[in-house]
Every structure is written in C-alpha cells, then in structure tokens.
A protein has these predicted regions:
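RNase H-like (RuvC/DEDD) metal-dependent nuclease/polynucleotide-processing core
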Residues: 1-4, 8-276
Length: 276
C-alpha cells in the first residue's frame, strides 16, 4: 500500500506542475520514495486511473459550504452537487460567488465549512488568493472519474482512497505562522529557506501530534529544501497526513480518521474537532 501526497494546481504547467509525493509507512516511520510531476491535468488524470493501491492526501477542497449551496439552491447531496459544479465554467463560478459575497457584510463575505476553523483553511468558495474554488472545480471531477473512494463522500474502489489534506495545518503545528515558501522569486529569501529546514527537522524527529517520523535520503532532503516554491514540501506534508489516516484505518477506523461530519462539506484529514 503506497502513500501519496498531492500538491495540486488547477492550471498546471511545466513551470508549476502538480507535485505528487509517493512513499510508504512502517512502524511509525514514513519513507519518501519519489516525487512525481505532472504538467497537465490529463496526465495527472491518467495516473490517477492506474490500477494501484494507495491512500492519498490531496491539497484541494472536496466540498462547498452548505450555507452557500443552500443559498444558491444547488443540490444538497454531495455527488449531484459536484456534478452540477463541474458543469459550470470558471467565469460562472467567479460571477456567482462574487454576487454572493457582494450581498454580505464586511467581515462575513465568505461562507465557511465546519472544517475551515479547526484546520485554518481558506473557504472553499474563494476564487483568488488562493483560487481554491477552481482547484475543487478542476480536481474533484478527476477523482470522481478515476473511481477512487473519498471517505464520507463517495464509496468506490477501496484500494485507492483519497482524502482532503491541507499542508498548512501540519506546517503551522511545526513552525507556527513562519512563512516557508513563495512562488515570487523576490520573496524566496534565506529566512524562508531556514524555515523549510526547520520544518523538515521537526518532521524527521517525529515531534508532531500525528506521531510519525519522516525518513529522507540526503538527496531528497536537499530537493525539498531547494524547492523555494514549497510545492515539493507541501506534497510531502500531505503524504504524512495520509500516513496518519492510513494508521487510523489500520487501527479499525473505517473512515481513515475523519470524524462524523456534514456529508456535503467533507472534512480535512487530521483537523481536530472544534471545541464544544
């Protein structure tokens, strides 16, 4: 059983491809095996469909906020909602979501999922900074078409299990709000390089609440540190979250550590339950 972590892009290119970390776990140690890069959505879709066994963490939202869906009178079951959403253009998504936000007061423009606060994630309806609404629009249909299982959302091939991951959740636990990446070359500073080294050091020591130690070769360590965009490191963070989920499943949790949650919205793997 492989573990995968995916740093996704809704518009991949040779300059900024989709990055997939592949590894495996044993006795609390997570070993990185390889980093794969896909510069088109079609190439990534073909890889997803290959007959292989994996548990994966994908850095893209798997659902929309119920408040938004109900306001728009879209289907409130996950599958028909995603099918409806996939049929829209990006321009239609932007215009629809902008109109929703424009009608709401400052400080409450966006609707949120229940998982957003404990995970510290952006609302899945954001179309800019970051454009996670487009990531959902591009990525979830690929997972659906590939016939993978999405725990608490879609039951399909049990040998390929996809979970919504968020590298920022784990990164903040390890180094706080220190920035460790940037796509802007002018912001790819020595301070961010040091932060990537610190993040990897804590991962390799296993000093996280997930109880896992990352194992890297020297070459792999250098690759992750040298990628100033942080995409390779984010893929590895997602892989570690997938390893935690796999461990929960091995211990008897049929839902890979995901709590009972809104079956329209989904949940980010390893995000804590909100305080009562």
């Amino acid at each position: 059983m492989n573990l995968i972590g995916c740093d996704f892009s809704s518009s991949p290119s040779k300059r900024k491809p989709i990055v997939v970390a592949v590894g495996h776990a044993s006795a609390g140690r997570v070993q990185l095996q390889s980093l794969l890069r896909f510069d088109t959505l079609d190439a990534f879709a073909d890889w997803l469909k290959q007959p292989q066994a994996w548990v994966g963490g994908f850095d893209l939202p798997f659902g929309l906020p119920r408040e938004l869906v109900e306001h728009l009178q879209w289907p409130t079951d996950w599958l028909p909602c995603m099918q409806h959403y996939a049929g829209l253009t990006r321009a239609e998504i932007r215009d629809t979501f902008k109109a929703f936000c424009d009608a709401r007061p400052v400080g409450g423009k966006f609707a949120h999922r229940a998982t957003d606060t404990p995970a510290g994630s952006s609302p899945s309806m954001k179309w800019v900074n970051p454009p996670v609404a487009y990531m959902l629009h591009a990525g979830v249909p690929l997972l659906m078409a590939a016939g993978v299982t999405l725990p608490r959302l879609q039951v399909a091939d049990p040998s390929r299990v996809a979970l919504e991951a968020y590298p920022g959740l784990l990164a903040r636990e390890l180094i706080g709000n220190t920035s460790y990446k940037s796509d802007d070359k002018a912001k790819q500073t020595p301070e961010r390089l040091i932060a990537r080294k610190q993040l990897l050091q804590v991962l390799e020591l296993g000093q996280t609440r997930l109880g896992l130690r990352l194992k890297l070769t020297h070459a792999q360590h250098d690759t992750l540190v040298d990628d100033a965009s942080g995409d390779s490191l984010d893929a590895v963070l997602c892989m570690v979250q997938a390893a935690w989920a796999q461990a929960q499943h091995a211990a008897g949790d049929a839902y890979y550590g995901l709590p009972a949650c809104d079956p329209l919205e989904g949940w980010i793997v390893s995000a804590p339950l909100p305080s009562a």
